[in-house]
């Protein structure tokens, strides 16, 4: 969880932790809160996020002709670059890739580099083609579209994510901006496997490409409901798993 909180610092300054979420749910005894939490960590919600992302390209962009000194790109040219040449770049990083392409083209033709000040002006022109680059707001659109309570519309300093939203927002961040793959990690060990959700395993599989050892006891969980992760792990890891089930305990309890 601490890793997720650090990754989200540029989006929200604070996140509810797992234990505060459990305590809040126990106090309120609200079945809907528990169900909503499980829904947002599920395979179905990942599907909703992917559907939302598929339509976001058109809703998030406001293309316009770029003209700055010798750099000139029409709206039509930018649309073609966005949807074809750079279609595989993450959505919120795509205009940066197009900007670099245009700047490189200009600098090659004129034989000189743009200054830092000029590059900032060009970057600002490209950034203005996004309706917003604020992932907090974009996640709010997703919640509204899916029929969930929306996030408070507040400035950065007053934002706080409930625990149920932490990993959906992290997933959205990685899909929109790209993710760092931790290639220096050679083997990952995950304990208490039963306390990780479908969505958490999807994120782990995206950022760690090494072999993993995943350990746990499905009968021991922080959640009220028992979660058998072995039901979905083969799908997350494309069947590339070797399962060992130990039916006898060697634990000594004093």
Question: Where are the regions that the model predicts?
Answer:
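P-loop NTPase motor core
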Residues: 1-61
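Conserved helicase motor core of SF1/SF2 NTP-dependent helicases
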Residues: 3-11, 149, 154, 173-187, ...
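Generic preference for flexible, low-structure residues
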Residues: 10-18, 24, 65, 114, ...
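Detector for methionine-enriched segments
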Residues: 26, 48-49, 61, 95, ...
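Conserved helicase NTPase catalytic core signature
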Residues: 39-187, 197-201
């Amino acid at each position: 969880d601490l890793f997720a909180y650090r990754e989200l610092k540029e989006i929200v300054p604070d996140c509810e932790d797992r234990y505060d979420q459990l305590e809040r749910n126990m106090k309120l005894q609200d079945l809907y809160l528990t169900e909503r939490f499980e829904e947002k960590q599920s395979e179905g919600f990942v599907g909703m996020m992917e559907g939302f992302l598929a339509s976001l390209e058109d809703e998030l962009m406001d293309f316009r002709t770029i003209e700055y000194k010798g750099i000139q790109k029409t709206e039509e040219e930018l649309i073609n670059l966005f949807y074809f040449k750079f279609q595989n770049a993450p959505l919120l990083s795509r205009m940066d890739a197009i900007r670099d392409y245009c700047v490189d083209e200009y600098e090659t033709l004129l034989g000189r580099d743009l200054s830092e000040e000029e590059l900032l002006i060009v970057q600002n022109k490209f950034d203005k083609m996004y309706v917003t680059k604020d992932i907090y707001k974009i996640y709010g659109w997703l919640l509204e579209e899916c029929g969930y309570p929306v996030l408070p519309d507040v400035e950065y300093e007053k934002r706080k994510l409930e625990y149920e939203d932490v990993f959906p927002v992290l997933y959205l961040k990685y899909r929109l901006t790209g993710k760092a793959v931790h290639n220096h990690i050679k083997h990952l060990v995950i304990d208490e496997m039963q306390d990780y959700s479908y969505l958490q395993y999807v994120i782990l599989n995206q950022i760690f490409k090494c072999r993993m050892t995943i350990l746990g006891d499905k009968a021991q969980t922080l959640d009220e409901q028992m979660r058998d992760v072995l039901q979905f792990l083969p799908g997350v890891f494309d069947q590339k798993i070797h399962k060992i089930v130990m039916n006898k305990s060697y634990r000594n309890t004093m």
